[in-house]
């Protein structure tokens, strides 16, 4: 998910294009569609609502370039820069199954918002996540689904120039 944090993004992508060798491949994992993974939005909302109770302005500024967070805007940007390369986006949903307690702790780490909390508030958040996972568990196990997109850029020509 490193590409998600890059800002400014355009110089990063242009540098990647410049150093990409003939038949070379650049790949990145970026955010997926929030609605494509069962339960993801609920977990997202639990975490962000909790953090915003403590830090009301949290989320007003995003980390990285916001164009990476939307497949439509990222696709447009990548096609503009890598116009003479093969570009593919593949959606994925990563699934994790574990006991509610373990899953609550592990899942919180996928969200930067949880990292701004004090130890005391973090434990309260984990407790809220555990309660959510307790309600959705089957045979003692709960599931967390994480949406992601895999970007793959392949340089298919000997000259993959920077300027069009």
Model-derived regions, located:
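Short catalytic micro-motifs in class I SAM-dependent methyltransferases
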Residues: 1-5
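Non-membrane alpha-helical structural segments and their capping/turn regions in soluble enzymes
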Residues: 6, 10, 123-126
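Conserved catalytic/acceptor-binding region of the Class I
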Residues: 10-11, 17-94
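Hydrophobic alpha-helical core bundles mediating ligand binding, dimerization, or RNAP-core interactions
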Residues: 40-47, 71-74, 78, 104-107, ...
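Core SAM-dependent methyltransferase catalytic element
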Residues: 81-83, 104-107, 146-164
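C-terminal helical/coil "lid" or tail adjacent to the Rossmann-like core of SAM-dependent
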Residues: 86-140
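C-terminal alpha-helical interaction module
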Residues: 134-135, 141-142, 146-151
């Amino acid at each position: 998910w490193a590409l998600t944090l890059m800002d400014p993004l355009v110089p990063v992508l242009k540098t990647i294009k410049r150093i990409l060798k003939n038949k070379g491949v650049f790949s990145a994992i970026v955010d997926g569609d929030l609605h494509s993974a069962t339960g993801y939005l609920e977990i997202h909302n639990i975490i962000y609502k909790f953090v915003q109770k403590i830090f009301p302005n949290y989320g007003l500024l995003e980390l990285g370039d916001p164009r990476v967070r939307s497949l439509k805007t990222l696709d447009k940007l990548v096609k503009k820069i890598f116009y003479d390369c093969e570009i593919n986006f593949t959606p994925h949903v990563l699934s994790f199954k574990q006991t509610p307690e373990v899953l609550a702790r592990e899942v919180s780490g996928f969200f930067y918002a949880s990292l701004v909390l004090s130890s005391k508030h973090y434990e309260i958040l984990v407790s809220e996540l555990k309660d959510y996972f307790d309600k959705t568990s089957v045979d003692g196990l709960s599931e967390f689904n994480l949406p992601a997109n895999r970007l793959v850029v392949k340089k298919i020509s000997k000259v993959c120039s920077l300027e069009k």
